[in-house]
């Protein structure tokens, strides 16, 4: 029998030894690295970074290569009428060439000498026409639109970064809760097993006394009923441990059936001091800064909306080459040229469209301000409640520790009095039950204190990864 016991003990020892023991910090880090919401927030930040670089390019000129090729079967005849061309001779007095004509009395001229110019008829064919070149566009003044859009993209990037911190703090709190569930469940197993050991020892004494005629069968049954209850408690506690570990595995990105354990010493910090809910602490929260950035975003949106109804000035230009068209079989166009153009647009009258759009943007800005004030009040309330809960949890730990100490002393005194017959079995069982409850309350209070501290740090903006 002893050999079988040692074999079972060895197997259990090996099993527990193979479990990976995780610290609270390791669980937090794994949860942040594997959480999908954190990953989404990081992708959003990456996207916002690309948006900043995208809108920055609007300050720079844009170059494009343009090309087009047209082939047309269209053609037409070009007729140039004939006539007389005057002949010029050099006039020494005038120092220039003058036409050889005679002025009539009615003011008309008669050509003294002329050359005949016969009429011309030529074929113009569209044939193949090619156009190609390099064009550029450079905004000079867009009413502040380019600057406003760029500023909005930078604000969006800041908000994305703050959202990562916010999501990480939420994940840390959720991980702390899952971690604490494992510690609580493990400690409850210890409570139940310690209570069982106490009952087992009592049962041996009562059963021995019954065999010697010093106790009744009813006394034995009373102890057995308590033993059955504690067996069920142990089973429930072990089930709670398994479920709590699976829940923790879910948060830290491990398979649900992974063999893990936690370091319970993280929750045994004896240095507990009360806190004061200073409203200025909410300034540390990423949510607070996000609200301020949203206000700035709404302010820039007003500028962006107004820019649609302000003057726009832009510079365009480039170099274009054209080759095409034939006149009597010879290429008519075959050259290139540089060009530049300044465009100016000034909205004049849109039936109040711009005014209404700007007012809508300003209304959104006021809504953002109201939202900020409302959420600031909510964060202050959350901080106050978290501080109260933490202070109450500190007081509760002190009380349960004292109650446990008193319950331990009470069960010792009860055992002595029971052994000498000054106390009934029912009274002694009640003392043991009070000790078990005090032990469980102390475990619950310590776990609750750890959670209240974690939630307070989040509410105060101090729980950052």
Report the location of each language-model feature.
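Periplasmic alpha-helical coiled-coil/stalk elements that build and connect Gram-negative outer-membrane
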Residues: 50, 162-282, 389, 393, ...
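Small/polar, glycine/serine/threonine/aspartate-rich low-complexity segments that form flexible
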Residues: 66-135, 263-272, 317-346
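Amphipathic alpha-helical coiled-coil scaffold segments and their short linker/junction regions
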Residues: 28-34, 84-119, 254-317
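Acidic, low-complexity, intrinsically disordered peripheral segments
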Residues: 64, 71-90, 441-465
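Hydrophobic h-region of N-terminal signal peptides that target proteins for export
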Residues: 9-18
């Amino acid at each position: 029998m002893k050999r079988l016991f040692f074999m079972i003990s060895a197997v259990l020892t090996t099993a527990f030894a193979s479990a990976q023991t995780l610290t609270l910090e390791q669980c937090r880090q794994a949860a942040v690295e594997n959480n999908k919401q954190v990953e989404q927030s990081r992708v959003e930040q990456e996207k916002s970074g690309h948006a900043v670089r995208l809108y920055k390019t609007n300050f720079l000129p844009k170059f494009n290569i343009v090309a087009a090729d047209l082939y047309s079967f269209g053609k037409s005849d070009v007729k140039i009428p004939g006539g007389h061309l005057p002949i010029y001779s050099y006039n020494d007095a005038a120092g220039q060439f003058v036409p050889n004509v005679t002025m009539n009395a009615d003011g008309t001229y008669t050509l003294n000498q002329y050359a005949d110019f016969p009429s011309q008829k030529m074929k113009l064919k569209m044939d193949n026409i090619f156009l190609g070149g390099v064009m550029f566009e450079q905004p000079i003044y867009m009413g502040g639109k380019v600057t406003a859009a760029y500023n909005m993209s930078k604000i969006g990037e800041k908000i994305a970064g703050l959202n990562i911190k916010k999501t990480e703090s939420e994940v840390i709190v959720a991980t702390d809760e899952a971690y604490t569930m494992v510690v609580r469940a493990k400690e409850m197993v210890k409570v139940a097993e310690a209570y069982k050991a106490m009952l087992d020892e009592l049962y041996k004494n009562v059963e021995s006394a019954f065999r010697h005629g010093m106790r009744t069968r009813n006394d034995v049954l009373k102890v057995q009923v308590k033993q059955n209850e504690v067996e069920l408690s142990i089973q429930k506690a072990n089930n709670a441990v398994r479920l709590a570990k699976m829940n923790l595995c879910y948060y830290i990105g491990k398979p649900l059936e992974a063999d893990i354990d936690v370091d319970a010493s993280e929750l045994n910090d004896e240095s507990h001091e009360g806190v004061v809910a200073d409203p200025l602490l909410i300034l540390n929260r990423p949510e607070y800064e996000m609200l301020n950035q949203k206000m700035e975003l709404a302010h820039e949106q007003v500028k962006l909306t107004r820019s649609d109804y302000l003057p726009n000035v832009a510079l365009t230009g480039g170099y274009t080459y054209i080759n095409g068209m034939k006149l009597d079989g010879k290429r008519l166009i075959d050259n290139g040229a540089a060009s530049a153009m300044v465009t100016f647009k000034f909205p004049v009258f849109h039936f109040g469209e711009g005014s209404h759009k700007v007012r809508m943007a300003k209304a959104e800005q006021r809504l953002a301000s109201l939202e900020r004030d409302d959420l600031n009040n909510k964060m202050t309330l959350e901080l106050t409640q978290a501080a109260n809960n933490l202070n109450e949890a500190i007081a509760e730990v002190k009380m349960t520790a004292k109650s446990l100490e008193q319950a331990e002393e009470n069960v010792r005194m009860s055992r002595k009095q029971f052994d000498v017959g000054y106390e009934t079995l029912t009274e002694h069982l009640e003392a043991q039950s009070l000790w078990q409850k005090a032990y469980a309350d102390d475990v619950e209070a310590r776990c609750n204190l750890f959670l209240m501290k974690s939630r307070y740090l989040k509410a105060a903006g101090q729980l950052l990864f």
